[in-house]
Amino acid sequence: MGLALQHSHRWDLSPREAANLQTRLRPLVLAEDALPDEIRTVAGVDVGFEDHGRITRAAVAVLDFPSLRPSDQAIVRRPTRFPYVPGLLSFRELPALLEALERLNLLPGLILVDGHGYAHPRRFGIACHLGVLTGIPTIGVGKTRLVGTHGELAEDRGSWIPLIDGDETVGAVVRTRRGVQPVYVSVGHRLSLPTAVDWVLRCTPRYRLPETTRQAHRLASA
């Protein structure tokens, strides 16, 4: 199924130009619920690197919802064109991920991104970037904290507390499984933070990470 981008831009940018573009695109993020009436598929995206970082390997894993059974996948390899710069992950990874999405038979109703969304120094992480370009609802699910501070989180599965940066709530610290480290959830595009947390928990029935992320990581690192 063809991927019709809602917005597009050049990718051959310097790190300074890329950071400025994030600031310009940030107002396009919709941090309120605008999901499809029914979500039948959810996807995870992840990226690995081959040949000492010279090749980007992007993977998309699509799962039926609510069964979370794999239904489609795509893997793309292409030369890495952008350096590793903290906070500019999307410029290194998104060109290959967009190509992988283009190869799917059917676009997913929701994408969980292995990375951050609004919980980002310029409030425009890779989950926001992907959502704004494609128009698909997206959630950032980070394994580590990029910005912000938080209080003590209860041990029970489903517990969550705000992630605060300055005077702003930028995400949520979420316990997806009792006795394991939390994940850092943030809005990507077209949903609110409570809804993002709810969907992450729905997609994380057994392990610390969502099943979408686990399947995409398996493809990206195989």
From Swiss-Prot:
InterPro entries: Endonuclease-V. GO terms for biological process: DNA repair. Keywords: Cytoplasm, DNA damage, DNA repair, Endonuclease, Hydrolase, Magnesium, Metal-binding, Nuclease. It catalyses: Endonucleolytic cleavage at apurinic or apyrimidinic sites to products with a 5'-phosphate. It is found in: Cytoplasm. The keyword Cytoplasm applies. Its cofactor is Mg(2+). One of its GO terms (molecular function) is deoxyribonuclease V activity. Its EC number is 3.1.21.7. Belongs to the endonuclease V family. HAMAP family: Endonuclease_5 (MF_00801). This is Endonuclease V. The lineage of its organism: Bacteria, Pseudomonadati, Pseudomonadota, Gammaproteobacteria, Methylococcales. The gene is nfi.
